[in-house]
């Protein structure tokens, strides 16, 4: 058996490069405490959907489109028209245009064979021996990884401080489970393995005879077989690089997985050698979509064209006249699709109410410490680093801070006592009856958790006046709020108040890093109520009237209740304004709940919705962002009074106030990217739930405090649970790539895309669709890739009439 790397490798550095590429093909997964949506195709956005479909079929047996019956049903119902099919064919790569409408219709009614991944050595060995080696690997790796990554859940945590590869070797060298299952001398082989991950990868590549052109997809497959553990390791690398460092965990994982492959290959060489040679050859072949995958990609494009046609019709509807008088109330909400329903309901209360859409972190990238806590919460988009630090409370709350810390420690100690191996059984026998009342109250949903009510947050250290003025000006200009201020302006963050839900943070604000948005809203309200800051803004051309008062609020997206943080900045002069605002918000909440109840299973009326978040057994307290289809950056008058069904991210933007297009650049590179992550996570969890979905909530167990497994162990599940995209009978989410509609000059958008290759790749390769709105707010131009635009005219027209390309 040779230990020499095959001659197809050009140089020693090539192996490191391929290992790194495989690692970056895995998307990161954030821990449960601050989980955010992640694009599961993050490592493949340089390729179009069909090619990624071929790649993921090879390494994971994953689909990237829906089953064909889904498209067939939409064609039969008239949702997808012949014009949509023609447009999809016309927009397909040249090599995929050898189909016509008739072919597509026939294909939609004939389900293609599901993709099947190339077999791993573990699978070949399982076939040869009858032993479930992939299952054993998943179970043993998961048991070790749960302890290695533990964030405080385990009572007996694994030792910290070692790199993943070294820590695993220390455990695996004494783990006899593989040998009991039939893998001879595995523990001994692990103890004698090279000391570094790179050295073991070099040895395995040599022993398996793995050529260079086969390694990338094979290494990618190895990491995919580790499920969410590889995703969490990728998160460690993401966080390290964001801070300017590095992390080797994910390449250590690759080495660990390859040790298993090597051991199984050595034991079953005679039985599987011929099959392995065929697998190697298949891995070395270029990644190209099959005809079935190409057809599926065209059907997917047709479904998206149909949705865009419906959106264009909605945007073309008559808009109400713009408000000329001073608004009675201005409310700035997060761009989250759930806010669209509430904003529309609130605006229906009075024509003098103006709502604004802006990213829910309100432009303040802060690392925050909650009251009586030393935990740093990064309340900002995960793409960014915090520029500010903040905390809740101050010297006046010191005594309460200390008493709260003592109570928290006591609760933690009591909780660990209840779960400890020695005391847990005696605890249940001795104190079980005492908990009957609490158990009944919780089980019946009688306990109502209050909204976050920490003392007013403050920046620490406090920036100087010039910085505070600059920050305030940047935020106001970014939300196009520079004039015509109301007497009362609300900054409304959002969160979700739910119980018995490990994925609760996924219901919070993605722009706030998986936390609720009240901290950022309260900080901004404090900043703009500062008289010195207002004076600086006035000198810079933003005149805020003396009678304008800013108040922070929190929208509970499960109940549609809104909490106002009035104690931060009490104002007797605005008592009447606040009472009226409360009435409007309460009425709007009822309207929003009524609309949302139509989509939720077993929601008989709006009154039943608040109970869902308190119900232990409720797997769907709300739909969160299911159904998201569009991102619209334009003045609110373009969408006001038009029902977008809670399916659109709405960002206020007036390009005529954006002289340098710096706000446009910010929108394209931050909110649009975050929205794409959300949209594509829902997409991936729907089309490939076994690979990119979070599994079944009914089977979830939290492990390590960082994620969930199904059952008693094994692979970490990432992505959205099935109950988040399906109501038990039908899909709650139509997996459509996001349509981004922006009212701005095409030249400006092209120039920005030209400066940001990663963002441009999302549009050039079809992971996002980009449209330019005209001066009437209608979808007039489609981005055609390569910094070119197509005039789209009537979206109902056949595609041939839409092929005019204009370079700008």
Curated annotation (Swiss-Prot):
Protein family per UniProt: Belongs to the inorganic carbon transporter (TC 9.A.2) DabA family.
A Pfam family that the UniProt record links to this protein: DabA
Quaternary assembly: Forms a complex with DabB.
InterPro entries on file: DabA
Record protein name field: Probable inorganic carbon transporter subunit DabA
Lineage per the UniProt record: Bacteria, Pseudomonadati, Pseudomonadota, Alphaproteobacteria, Acetobacterales
Membrane topology: Peripheral membrane protein
Protein's cellular compartments: Cell inner membrane
Record function comment: Part of an energy-coupled inorganic carbon pump.
Location (main, coarse): membrane
Cofactor: Zn(2+)
Residues binding Zn(2+): 334, 336, 494, 509
Gene: dabA
């Amino acid at each position: 058996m040779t230990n020499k790397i095959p001659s197809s490798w050009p140089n020693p550095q090539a192996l490191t490069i391929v290992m790194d590429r495989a690692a970056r093909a895995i998307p990161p997964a954030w821990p449960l405490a601050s989980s955010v949506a992640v694009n599961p195709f993050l490592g493949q956005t340089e390729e179009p959907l069909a090619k990624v479909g071929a790649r993921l079929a090879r390494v994971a047996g994953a689909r990237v489109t829906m089953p064909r019956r889904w498209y067939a049903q939409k064609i039969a119902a008239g949702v997808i028209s012949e014009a949509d099919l023609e447009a999809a064919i016309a927009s397909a790569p040249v090599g995929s245009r050898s189909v016509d409408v008739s072919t597509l219709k026939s294909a939609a009614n004939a389900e293609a064979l599901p993709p099947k991944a190339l077999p791993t050595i573990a699978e070949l060995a399982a076939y040869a021996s009858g032993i479930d080696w992939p299952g054993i690997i998943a179970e043993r790796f998961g048991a070790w990884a749960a302890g290695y990554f533990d964030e405080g859940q385990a009572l007996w945590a694994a030792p910290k401080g070692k790199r993943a590869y070294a820590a695993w070797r220390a455990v695996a060298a004494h783990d006899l489970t593989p040998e009991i299952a039939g893998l001879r001398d595995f523990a001994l082989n692990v103890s004698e393995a090279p000391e570094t991950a790179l050295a073991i990868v070099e040895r395995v590549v040599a022993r398996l005879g793995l050529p260079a052109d086969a390694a990338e997809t094979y290494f990618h497959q190895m990491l995919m077989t580790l499920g969410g553990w590889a995703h969490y390791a990728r998160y460690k690398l993401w966080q390290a690089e964001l801070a300017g460092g590095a992390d080797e965990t994910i390449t250590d994982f690759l080495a660990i997985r390859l040790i298993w492959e090597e051991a199984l290959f050595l034991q079953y060489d005679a039985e599987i050698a011929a099959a392995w040679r065929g697998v190697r050859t298949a891995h070395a072949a270029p990644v190209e979509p099959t005809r079935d995958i190409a057809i599926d990609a065209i059907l997917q494009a047709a479904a998206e064209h149909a949705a865009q046609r419906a959106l264009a019709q909605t945007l073309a509807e008559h808009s109400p006249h713009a408000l000329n008088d001073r608004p009675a109330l201005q409310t700035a909400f997060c761009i989250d699709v759930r806010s669209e329903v509430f904003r529309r309901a609130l605006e229906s209360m009075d024509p003098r109410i103006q709502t604004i859409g802006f990213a829910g972190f309100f432009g303040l990238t802060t690392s925050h410490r909650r009251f009586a806590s030393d935990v740093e919460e990064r309340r900002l988009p995960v793409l960014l680093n915090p520029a500010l630090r903040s905390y809740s409370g101050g010297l006046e709350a010191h005594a309460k801070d200390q008493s709260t810390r003592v109570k928290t420690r006591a609760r933690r100690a009591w909780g660990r006592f209840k779960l400890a191996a020695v005391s847990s059984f005696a605890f249940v026998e001795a104190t079980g009856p005492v908990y009957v009342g609490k158990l009944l109250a919780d089980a019946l949903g009688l306990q109502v958790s209050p909204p976050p009510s920490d003392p007013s947050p403050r920046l620490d250290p406090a920036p100087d006046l010039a910085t505070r003025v600059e920050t305030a000006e940047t935020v106001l200009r970014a939300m196009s709020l520079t004039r015509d201020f109301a007497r009362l302006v609300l900054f409304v963050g959002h969160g979700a108040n739910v119980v018995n839900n490990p994925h609760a943070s996924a219901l919070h604000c993605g722009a706030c890093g998986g936390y609720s948005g009240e901290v950022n809203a309260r900080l901004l309200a404090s900043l703009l109520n500062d008289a010195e800051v207002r004076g600086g803004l006035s000198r810079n051309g933003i005149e805020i009237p003396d009678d304008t008062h800013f108040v922070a609020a929190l929208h509970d997206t499960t109940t549609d209740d809104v909490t106002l943080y009035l104690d931060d900045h009490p104002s007797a002069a605005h008592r009447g304004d606040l009472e009226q605002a409360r009435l409007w918000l309460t009425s709007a909440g009822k309207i929003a709940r009524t609309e949302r109840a139509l989509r939720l299973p077993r929601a008989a009326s709006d009154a039943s919705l608040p109970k869902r978040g308190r119900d232990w057994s409720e797997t769907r307290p709300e739909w969160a962002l299911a159904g998201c289809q569009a991102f619209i950056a334009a003045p609110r008058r373009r969408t006001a009074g038009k029902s977008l069904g809670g399916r659109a991210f709405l960002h206020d933007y007036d390009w005529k106030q954006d002289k340098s297009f710096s706000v446009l650049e910010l929108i394209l590179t931050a909110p649009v990217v975050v929205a794409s992550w959300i949209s594509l996570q829902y997409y991936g969890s729907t089309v490939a739930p076994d690979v990119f979905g979070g599994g079944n909530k009914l089977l979830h167990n939290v492990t390590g405090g960082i994620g969930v497994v199904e059952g008693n162990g094994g692979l970490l599940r990432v992505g959205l649970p099935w109950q988040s995209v399906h109501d038990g009978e039908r899909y709650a989410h139509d997996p459509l790539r996001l349509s981004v509609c922006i009212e701005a000059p095409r030249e400006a958008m092209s120039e920005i895309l030209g400066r940001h290759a990663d963002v441009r790749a999302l549009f050039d390769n079809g992971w996002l669709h980009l449209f330019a709105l005209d001066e009437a707010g209608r979808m007039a131009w489609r981005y055609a890739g390569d910094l070119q635009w197509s005039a789209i005219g009537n979206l109902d027209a056949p595609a041939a009439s839409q092929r005019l390309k204009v370079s700008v």
